[in-house]
Regions:
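Catalytic helix-loop patch of NAD(P)-dependent Rossmann-fold dehydrogenases
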Residues: 38
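A short beta-strand-loop structural module common to alpha/beta enzyme folds
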Residues: 27-35
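Cofactor-binding loop segments of dinucleotide-utilizing enzymes, especially the Rossmann-like FAD-
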Residues: 11, 31, 148
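Anionic-ligand binding patches
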Residues: 2-7, 41-229
Length: 229
């Protein structure tokens, strides 16, 4: 896969760390969208929101790069015939520049027909944990990749099943009122203190943390394979 400049359209420190663990050094540009979707099926919800996030950042980046591209185009059109060979070499060099890819992602937890996002209060976190304890739920992440120069894009969803052990009322309350749940879908972080309550997992662990690492890497490869056809 060619060298890429990866832009993460998320302020999640966990997604940033996952991308670093698999060899990328992303830049972070947070999307400014109000998260809203008309979708109701979990996979479609997260794919739609990931498209919105990535699209917002990609549009802002494209707008900021437009004057530079226009200037380069004007210069190339005014070159003398004697410079054409040199221009060809410069164009070849420019094609070796890293591709700019924007990555947007969204994650939800699903249980009993309900979609759980991030809790807005400790009380809501406690309610979520009561729904999750003692049973199996699904974590669903949507990811969108947009290659800025070509406009090619790819969106997918990844689902992981997580089994939570039975918890006492005190365990639920103590965890819900800690600092951990507030910025996490479903009100828990598998990579933190809540790990002691995980009874089993089926699927990609990193997906539960916030970004399916393997699927992201394979999808990046697919994005550039399609661009070579």
């Amino acid at each position: 896969m060619k060298e890429i400049r990866l832009i993460l359209a998320s302020q999640s420190p966990r997604r940033l760390e996952i991308l670093r663990q698999i060899g990328f050094q992303p830049e972070v540009i947070v999307s400014g969208i109000e998260e809203h979707t008309e979708e109701t099926i979990p996979e479609r919800v997260v794919m739609d929101l990931s498209r919105q996030k990535a699209g917002n950042v990609a549009a802002r980046l494209a707008a900021s790069l437009m004057p530079v591209n226009d200037l380069a185009g004007r210069k190339s059109r005014t070159k003398a015939a004697s410079d054409r060979e040199t221009s060809g070499l410069e164009a070849a060099d420019s094609r070796q520049e890293p591709a700019v890819v924007v990555l947007g992602a969204d994650t939800v937890v699903c249980t009993g027909g309900r979609i759980l996002g991030k809790p807005h209060s400790h009380e809501e976190a406690e309610e979520m944990l009561r729904l999750l304890q003692g049973r199996t739920h699904q974590v669903c992440s949507g990811v969108t990749l947009i290659e800025l120069r070509s406009g090619r894009s790819l969106t997918f969803a990844e689902k992981t099943e997580v089994e939570v052990a039975p918890m006492t009322n005190k365990e639920i309350h103590d965890y819900a009122y800690s600092a951990e749940p507030m910025d996490k879908a479903g009100g828990y972080g598998i990579q933190g203190f809540f790990g002691r309550y995980i009874a089993g997992i089926r699927g990609d662990y990193t997906n539960v943390v916030g970004l399916p690492a393997g699927a992201v890497y394979q999808s990046l490869k697919q994005l550039f394979r399609e661009g070579q056809r």
